[in-house]
Protein backbone atom coordinates (compact mmCIF):
# COMPACT_ATOMS: atom_id res chain seq x y z
CA UNK A 1 0.00 0.00 0.00
CA UNK A 2 0.94 3.65 -0.41
CA UNK A 3 1.00 5.21 3.06
CA UNK A 4 1.20 8.99 3.48
CA UNK A 5 2.70 9.99 6.83
CA UNK A 6 3.12 13.24 8.72
CA UNK A 7 5.87 13.22 11.33
CA UNK A 8 7.77 10.62 9.31
CA UNK A 9 11.15 12.06 10.33
CA UNK A 10 10.36 12.04 14.06
CA UNK A 11 11.25 9.38 16.61
CA UNK A 12 8.03 7.38 16.21
CA UNK A 13 7.75 8.10 12.50
CA UNK A 14 11.22 6.74 11.70
CA UNK A 15 10.60 3.48 13.53
CA UNK A 16 7.15 3.09 12.03
CA UNK A 17 8.32 3.89 8.50
CA UNK A 18 11.06 1.27 8.75
CA UNK A 19 8.67 -1.32 10.15
CA UNK A 20 5.94 -0.80 7.56
CA UNK A 21 8.50 -0.80 4.74
CA UNK A 22 10.59 -3.78 5.86
CA UNK A 23 7.90 -5.98 7.41
CA UNK A 24 4.81 -4.95 5.52
CA UNK A 25 6.24 -4.11 2.11
CA UNK A 26 4.42 -0.78 2.10
CA UNK A 27 5.60 2.43 0.44
CA UNK A 28 5.90 5.45 2.74
CA UNK A 29 5.21 8.92 1.36
CA UNK A 30 6.42 11.54 3.87
CA UNK A 31 4.23 14.63 4.18
CA UNK A 32 6.73 17.33 5.18
CA UNK A 33 5.98 20.68 6.79
CA UNK A 34 6.24 22.51 3.48
CA UNK A 35 3.18 20.67 2.21
CA UNK A 36 1.03 22.30 4.92
CA UNK A 37 1.95 25.90 4.18
CA UNK A 38 -0.64 28.24 2.75
CA UNK A 39 -0.84 27.89 -1.01
CA UNK A 40 0.28 24.24 -1.01
CA UNK A 41 -3.16 22.64 -0.69
CA UNK A 42 -3.16 21.56 -4.33
CA UNK A 43 0.02 19.52 -3.87
CA UNK A 44 -1.39 17.90 -0.73
CA UNK A 45 -4.58 16.92 -2.56
CA UNK A 46 -2.55 15.51 -5.44
CA UNK A 47 -0.38 13.47 -3.04
CA UNK A 48 -3.33 12.05 -1.09
CA UNK A 49 -5.05 11.05 -4.33
CA UNK A 50 -2.51 8.25 -4.71
CA UNK A 51 -2.58 7.01 -1.09
CA UNK A 52 -4.34 4.06 0.50
CA UNK A 53 -3.61 5.06 4.10
CA UNK A 54 -2.81 8.30 5.95
CA UNK A 55 -0.95 8.20 9.27
CA UNK A 56 -0.97 11.55 11.06
CA UNK A 57 1.83 11.77 13.65
CA UNK A 58 2.54 15.50 13.36
CA UNK A 59 3.16 17.42 16.56
CA UNK A 60 5.77 19.60 18.26
CA UNK A 61 7.45 18.08 21.37
CA UNK A 62 5.30 18.30 24.50
CA UNK A 63 8.05 17.88 27.12
CA UNK A 64 9.29 21.44 27.47
CA UNK A 65 8.06 24.60 29.20
CA UNK A 66 4.61 25.59 27.93
CA UNK A 67 5.13 29.26 27.17
CA UNK A 68 2.26 30.97 25.32
CA UNK A 69 4.33 30.68 22.15
CA UNK A 70 4.99 26.96 22.63
CA UNK A 71 1.34 26.30 23.44
CA UNK A 72 0.44 27.89 20.13
CA UNK A 73 3.05 25.75 18.37
CA UNK A 74 1.66 22.61 20.03
CA UNK A 75 -1.80 23.57 18.81
CA UNK A 76 -0.79 24.55 15.27
CA UNK A 77 1.44 21.50 14.72
CA UNK A 78 -1.46 19.19 15.60
CA UNK A 79 -4.85 20.76 14.99
CA UNK A 80 -3.92 23.00 12.06
CA UNK A 81 -2.10 20.17 10.26
CA UNK A 82 -5.02 17.79 10.87
CA UNK A 83 -7.46 20.44 9.63
CA UNK A 84 -5.54 20.77 6.36
CA UNK A 85 -5.44 16.99 5.92
CA UNK A 86 -9.23 16.84 6.34
CA UNK A 87 -9.68 19.74 3.94
CA UNK A 88 -7.54 17.95 1.36
CA UNK A 89 -9.42 14.67 1.86
CA UNK A 90 -12.69 16.42 1.11
CA UNK A 91 -11.23 17.44 -2.25
CA UNK A 92 -9.93 13.95 -3.12
CA UNK A 93 -12.32 12.02 -5.36
CA UNK A 94 -11.12 8.52 -4.45
CA UNK A 95 -10.72 8.60 -0.68
CA UNK A 96 -7.98 6.65 1.15
CA UNK A 97 -9.17 3.48 2.86
CA UNK A 98 -7.87 4.47 6.30
CA UNK A 99 -6.72 7.45 8.32
CA UNK A 100 -4.85 6.84 11.59
CA UNK A 101 -4.60 10.04 13.62
CA UNK A 102 -2.47 10.25 16.75
CA UNK A 103 -3.57 11.60 20.10
CA UNK A 104 -2.39 10.93 23.66
CA UNK A 105 -3.54 9.47 26.96
CA UNK A 106 -3.34 13.02 28.31
CA UNK A 107 -6.95 13.15 27.12
CA UNK A 108 -8.00 11.24 30.26
CA UNK A 109 -8.38 12.42 33.88
CA UNK A 110 -5.32 12.02 36.09
CA UNK A 111 -5.11 9.25 38.68
CA UNK A 112 -8.43 7.65 37.66
CA UNK A 113 -8.44 4.30 35.84
CA UNK A 114 -9.71 4.87 32.30
CA UNK A 115 -10.16 3.06 29.00
CA UNK A 116 -11.72 3.85 25.64
CA UNK A 117 -15.21 3.53 27.13
CA UNK A 118 -14.56 6.25 29.74
CA UNK A 119 -16.94 9.14 29.10
CA UNK A 120 -15.13 11.90 30.99
CA UNK A 121 -11.92 13.65 29.99
CA UNK A 122 -9.29 15.41 32.03
CA UNK A 123 -8.80 19.05 32.96
CA UNK A 124 -6.08 21.38 31.81
CA UNK A 125 -4.17 22.25 28.68
CA UNK A 126 -3.05 18.76 27.67
CA UNK A 127 -6.55 17.31 27.78
CA UNK A 128 -7.92 20.32 25.90
CA UNK A 129 -5.22 19.88 23.25
CA UNK A 130 -6.03 16.18 22.78
CA UNK A 131 -9.76 16.90 22.64
CA UNK A 132 -9.34 19.56 19.93
CA UNK A 133 -6.95 17.30 17.99
CA UNK A 134 -9.39 14.39 18.01
CA UNK A 135 -12.37 16.62 17.24
CA UNK A 136 -10.65 17.79 14.07
CA UNK A 137 -9.73 14.21 13.07
CA UNK A 138 -13.35 13.12 13.51
CA UNK A 139 -14.27 15.36 10.58
CA UNK A 140 -12.62 12.73 8.35
CA UNK A 141 -14.98 12.19 5.40
CA UNK A 142 -16.64 8.88 4.55
CA UNK A 143 -15.91 6.25 3.40
CA UNK A 144 -12.40 6.63 4.87
CA UNK A 145 -12.13 4.54 8.03
CA UNK A 146 -10.84 6.54 11.01
CA UNK A 147 -8.69 5.19 13.86
CA UNK A 148 -7.58 7.54 16.65
CA UNK A 149 -4.61 6.28 18.66
CA UNK A 150 -4.06 7.64 22.17
CA UNK A 151 -0.36 7.06 22.85
CA UNK A 152 1.18 6.45 26.24
CA UNK A 153 4.87 7.21 26.80
CA UNK A 154 6.62 5.50 23.88
CA UNK A 155 9.79 3.71 24.97
CA UNK A 156 12.98 2.38 23.42
CA UNK A 157 16.61 2.94 24.48
CA UNK A 158 17.56 4.54 21.16
CA UNK A 159 15.47 7.69 21.48
CA UNK A 160 12.41 9.43 22.80
CA UNK A 161 11.44 9.56 26.46
CA UNK A 162 13.66 6.69 27.63
CA UNK A 163 16.75 8.27 26.11
CA UNK A 164 16.03 11.43 28.08
CA UNK A 165 15.65 9.39 31.28
CA UNK A 166 18.77 7.32 30.61
CA UNK A 167 21.07 10.27 29.95
CA UNK A 168 21.30 11.46 33.59
CA UNK A 169 21.20 7.87 34.90
CA UNK A 170 24.24 6.92 32.84
CA UNK A 171 26.06 10.10 33.88
CA UNK A 172 25.36 9.86 37.63
CA UNK A 173 24.39 6.21 38.23
CA UNK A 174 21.31 7.57 40.04
CA UNK A 175 17.76 6.70 38.99
CA UNK A 176 15.56 9.75 39.61
CA UNK A 177 11.92 9.13 40.52
CA UNK A 178 9.64 12.05 39.69
CA UNK A 179 7.81 12.86 42.93
CA UNK A 180 5.70 11.61 44.47
CA UNK A 181 6.35 8.42 42.45
CA UNK A 182 2.90 6.97 42.99
CA UNK A 183 1.48 8.60 39.86
CA UNK A 184 0.61 6.19 37.00
CA UNK A 185 3.11 5.77 34.19
CA UNK A 186 1.26 4.64 31.02
CA UNK A 187 3.80 3.29 28.55
CA UNK A 188 4.23 1.24 25.38
CA UNK A 189 7.28 -0.29 23.73
CA UNK A 190 7.99 1.14 20.27
CA UNK A 191 7.87 -2.36 18.79
CA UNK A 192 4.32 -2.90 19.99
CA UNK A 193 3.30 0.53 18.75
CA UNK A 194 4.55 -0.37 15.27
CA UNK A 195 2.80 -3.73 15.38
CA UNK A 196 -0.44 -2.10 16.53
CA UNK A 197 -0.38 0.36 13.63
CA UNK A 198 0.07 -2.53 11.18
CA UNK A 199 -2.78 -4.31 13.01
CA UNK A 200 -5.10 -1.38 12.26
CA UNK A 201 -4.13 -1.43 8.59
CA UNK A 202 -4.70 -5.18 8.27
CA UNK A 203 -8.00 -5.40 10.17
CA UNK A 204 -10.54 -3.39 8.23
CA UNK A 205 -13.30 -3.76 10.82
CA UNK A 206 -11.39 -1.68 13.39
CA UNK A 207 -12.32 1.98 13.78
CA UNK A 208 -12.63 4.59 16.51
CA UNK A 209 -10.41 5.26 19.54
CA UNK A 210 -7.70 2.86 20.73
CA UNK A 211 -5.32 3.31 23.66
CA UNK A 212 -1.75 2.41 22.73
CA UNK A 213 -0.42 1.48 26.15
CA UNK A 214 0.95 -1.77 27.57
CA UNK A 215 -1.52 -3.90 29.55
CA UNK A 216 0.66 -3.73 32.68
CA UNK A 217 -0.12 -0.62 34.74
CA UNK A 218 2.86 0.65 36.74
CA UNK A 219 3.69 3.69 38.84
CA UNK A 220 6.42 6.17 37.99
CA UNK A 221 8.46 4.82 40.92
CA UNK A 222 8.08 1.18 39.85
CA UNK A 223 9.17 2.00 36.31
CA UNK A 224 12.17 4.09 37.38
CA UNK A 225 13.39 1.47 39.86
CA UNK A 226 13.14 -1.25 37.19
CA UNK A 227 15.08 0.95 34.77
CA UNK A 228 17.69 1.68 37.43
CA UNK A 229 18.14 -2.03 38.13
CA UNK A 230 18.49 -2.83 34.42
CA UNK A 231 21.07 -0.09 33.88
CA UNK A 232 22.97 -0.71 37.15
CA UNK A 233 22.10 2.49 39.01
CA UNK A 234 23.83 2.77 42.38
CA UNK A 235 20.77 4.24 44.07
CA UNK A 236 17.30 5.68 43.49
CA UNK A 237 16.25 9.16 44.62
CA UNK A 238 12.84 10.82 44.67
CA UNK A 239 13.02 14.30 43.15
CA UNK A 240 10.31 16.60 44.59
CA UNK A 241 7.59 17.88 42.28
CA UNK A 242 8.64 21.45 43.06
CA UNK A 243 11.91 20.92 41.18
CA UNK A 244 10.03 20.01 38.00
CA UNK A 245 7.58 22.87 38.47
CA UNK A 246 10.52 25.28 38.64
CA UNK A 247 12.04 23.76 35.50
CA UNK A 248 8.92 23.25 33.41
CA UNK A 249 6.19 25.41 34.93
CA UNK A 250 2.71 24.27 33.90
CA UNK A 251 4.24 21.53 31.72
CA UNK A 252 5.43 19.75 34.89
CA UNK A 253 1.94 18.24 35.12
CA UNK A 254 2.97 16.06 32.17
CA UNK A 255 5.53 14.45 34.50
CA UNK A 256 3.98 14.70 37.97
CA UNK A 257 0.40 13.65 37.18
CA UNK A 258 -0.16 10.49 35.15
CA UNK A 259 -3.12 8.69 33.65
CA UNK A 260 -4.04 5.13 34.59
CA UNK A 261 -5.06 3.74 31.21
CA UNK A 262 -6.01 0.31 29.91
CA UNK A 263 -5.78 -0.85 26.23
CA UNK A 264 -9.22 -2.47 26.48
CA UNK A 265 -10.30 -2.19 22.84
CA UNK A 266 -6.95 -3.37 21.50
CA UNK A 267 -7.11 -6.47 23.69
CA UNK A 268 -10.75 -7.07 22.72
CA UNK A 269 -9.69 -6.97 19.06
CA UNK A 270 -7.23 -9.83 19.66
CA UNK A 271 -3.96 -7.88 19.63
CA UNK A 272 -1.14 -9.62 21.48
CA UNK A 273 1.58 -7.47 23.04
CA UNK A 274 5.14 -8.69 22.50
CA UNK A 275 6.30 -6.48 25.41
CA UNK A 276 3.40 -6.53 27.92
CA UNK A 277 5.42 -5.88 31.11
CA UNK A 278 8.34 -3.75 32.24
CA UNK A 279 10.18 -6.96 33.09
CA UNK A 280 9.95 -7.91 29.42
CA UNK A 281 10.89 -4.37 28.41
CA UNK A 282 14.16 -4.51 30.32
CA UNK A 283 15.00 -8.16 29.55
CA UNK A 284 17.34 -7.05 26.79
CA UNK A 285 18.53 -3.54 27.50
CA UNK A 286 20.83 -3.55 24.47
CA UNK A 287 18.14 -3.49 21.78
CA UNK A 288 19.36 -0.16 20.43
CA UNK A 289 19.01 -1.66 16.96
CA UNK A 290 15.51 -3.01 17.31
CA UNK A 291 14.38 -6.34 15.98
CA UNK A 292 10.73 -5.82 15.19
CA UNK A 293 8.56 -8.96 15.12
CA UNK A 294 6.43 -9.47 12.04
CA UNK A 295 3.27 -10.28 13.99
Language-model segment annotations:
Residues 124, 131, 141, 145-148, ...:
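NAD(P)-dependent short-chain dehydrogenase/reductase
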Residues 288-294:
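Conserved small/polar residues in nucleotide/adenosyl-binding loops
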Amino acid sequence: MNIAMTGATGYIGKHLSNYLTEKGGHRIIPLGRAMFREGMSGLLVQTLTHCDVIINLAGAPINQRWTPEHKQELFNSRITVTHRIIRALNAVKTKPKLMISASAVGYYPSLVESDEYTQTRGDGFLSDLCYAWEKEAKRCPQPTRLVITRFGVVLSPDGGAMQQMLRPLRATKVAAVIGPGTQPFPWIDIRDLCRAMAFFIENEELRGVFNLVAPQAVSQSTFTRAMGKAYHAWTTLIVPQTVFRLLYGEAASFLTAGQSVRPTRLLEAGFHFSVPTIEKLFEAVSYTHLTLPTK
